[in-house]
Amino acid sequence: MTMLAAMFYGPMDVRLEERPIPLPGEGEVLIQVAAATTCGTDVKTFRRGHPLLFQQVPAGFGHEVAGVIAAMGKDVTGFHEGDSVVAANSAPCQYCFYCRRGRYSLCENLLFLNGAYAEYLLVPERIVRQNLYKLEPGTSFIAAAMTEPLACALHGIEASDIHPGDTVVVIGAGPLGLLLAAIAKLHGAYVVITGRGAQRLSLAHYYGADVVIDANAMSFQEQEAVVRSHTDEQRGADVVIEAVGSPETWALAARMARHGGLVNFFGGCPSGTEVSLDTRSVHYGELTAKGIFHHTPVLFQQALELITDHRIDVEGLITARFPLAFTLDVFDMLLRKQGIKYALIPAAFELSLAKPTSLE
C-alpha cells in the first residue's frame, strides 16, 4: 500500500510522491497523520536546505504533526491503536555529555523526526518512549501539531530570566515571535513587539503585546529609538529576543537592551553568517547574550498542557487549512510571504477539519 508524501530532494526541490506506507518495527508507532502545520524552519529549509535535518535525501519533510495511531510494533506500552496523539520531532539520547548535564537540546546524538507532510508517519522507538503524548478530549489535531513551536518558544522564554514587570522586546512578528510574546505576557512582562507585515502585526495585541511597532518604513536606528521610548528613562529593554534570524537584527537586539540586560538570539541565521556587534556596549554594558536552539521533552509536555488548558490560542496563527495535496502551493505562498502559518490536512481527515475522532 502507498501513501501521499512530500519528499525533500534539495533546496527548492520538494516533490509530492506516492511512497510505501512504512511498517512499525519493535517499539515503533505508525501514525495516520490528521494535521501537519508549516514552520518557518521548513520554509528556510525549502529555500536553502538544512545542515542538521537532512543528511541523506530524499527524505520526508515537515515536523509539526498530530494524528491517530494506525499500527504499533512489538513491545510498545502505554498506547493503543486509535489513540489520538502528538509526536515531538526529536528525542535526546539521555547519556551523552550534555544529556548528563540536563542540556537535552544540545544532545550530541539528538534524534530528529521529519515526514509530517504525509498521510502516515513512522515514529521511532526513542521518540515513542520519550516524546509521544495522547491528546485530551476536545484538543484539535491542528492545535496539537503546534506543540512543537510552542515548546521552542517556551525554551526561549525559560532562558530569558523574565520577571514580572520586566520590559521584553520581541524583534519579529512571525509565528514564533507572537508565541514568544504570548508566553512573556504570561510571565507578567510588559511586551513590545516590532516587526513587518500588516497581517502579522494585526495579531500582536491578541498575543500579548502592549506596544506594537510597525518597522516596515523604519531604519534600524529609528526602531531602536522608538523601542527605547517605551522603556524606563529610555534605558532600553530588560530582555530583547531576536526572532527573525538575520545579522542586522541580531546587532539591533544588542543595541535595544539596557545595561545589565539580556539578549536572546532566538532566530537562527544561515550557517557561516557573521555578526558585527559594538563590543563597548556588550562589555561596559555588561550584557548577557544567549543562543537558543530547539526544545526538550519536558518543555514539549509543558507546551501541550498550555494548549490543552487553552492558555495560548495557537490555532489563531493558522491562516488557512489546505488538503495535503496542496503542499507545494502552500510553500509557494509562504516563500512569497503570503499568510502566517498553514495547516495541511490529509484526505482522510479533510471533512472533519482535523478534530479528534477516536479517544480512549
Predicted regions and their residues:
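NAD(P)H dinucleotide-binding glycine-rich loop of Rossmann-like/cofactor-binding domains
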Residues: 93-171
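Glycine-rich cofactor phosphate-binding loops and adjacent beta1-alpha1 units
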Residues: 160, 167, 207-287, 328, ...
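Mid-domain Rossmann-like dinucleotide-binding core that forms the NAD(H)/NADP(H) cofactor-binding site
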Residues: 139-218
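Glycine-rich beta-strand-centered segment in the early N-terminal region that forms part
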Residues: 22-36, 50-97, 134-136
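C-terminal hydrophobic helical "lid"/dimerization subdomain
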Residues: 1-5, 228, 251-255, 296-360
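Residues located in well-ordered beta-strands
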Residues: 4, 20, 32, 66-68, ...
